[in-house]
Amino acid sequence: MISVALLAGGTSRERQVSLRSGAAVQQALSAAGYNVVLLDTDCTDQQLLQNNVVFSVLHGAGGEDGQFQTRLEKLGLPFVGSDAASSRLTFDKHAYRQKLLAAGLPIAKGARVDWQTYPWHPLAQKPHVVKPSDGGSSIDTFIIRKPAQSDLLAIEQSFKTHKQMLLEQLIDGIEITVGILGDQPLPVIEIIPPASGEFDYINKYNGATQELCPPPHVKPQLQEKAQELALQAHQLTGCRDLSRTDMIVQKDGRIIILETNTLPGMTATSLFPKMAQVAGYDMPTLTDCLVKMALSRAETAAA
């Protein structure tokens, strides 16, 4: 029986989401017939090496930023997902932006700022988004339509944690997301936040947000274009096995890329498993497919 080291938890602020992803993946891999060994980042190299392959759902710093991938590469262990270089690139939202801009892909106007420069930046004088240059799950992401003193106080606290953050033009439109499995785009999901709020951390995980597939407000030709852009972003940044790219469809039909996630959530309410389900992959089938990709890559490299 193939043994899978399943890494979940970590020390980032996304630990709880990671643990939830881990629980879902553990159940799925077990149902698919694998021996699953659940580990956290404090595991030893020996514990890792006792397994055939690694499946990490470590979200956030230390898990998605290339650090853990570097460790696995040094050990020579096959693992699901993007390599260290691609993980570093996509986790650094500023570097990711520069990569896409250089390739001519559509992305929102933005800049990396610190607390001293943020309030005076031209983009901050209009509706905008402030978010960490690294990180995910919408933690410390602020959507500012009309600046208020309470917003500034909260943002100042975030700058104390992150030092530098990404300031982006707020793009209005229909929010969508597209996953890539292997080299194939998955169906598009349209995200409709509750009328009372945005697609923030709370609404992302409390089940209040509507996630519709197929997207009722996005024409089929625009869905195809979004899938093409997601695949381009996936390939341009060197992603492997899986990724999920978030975008906005504007009223005039233009599609703007927001970001690409190399390690999308795998919880019961996560977007990637939902779009995979529509494509015909239940969780056991999806996780089995991902493990086989990692093992096949290792076999090819050893040949």
Please give the residue ranges for each predicted region.
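Active-site "cap" helix and flanking loop/linker of ATP-utilizing ligase/carboxylase catalytic domains
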Residues: I191-S243, K274-A303
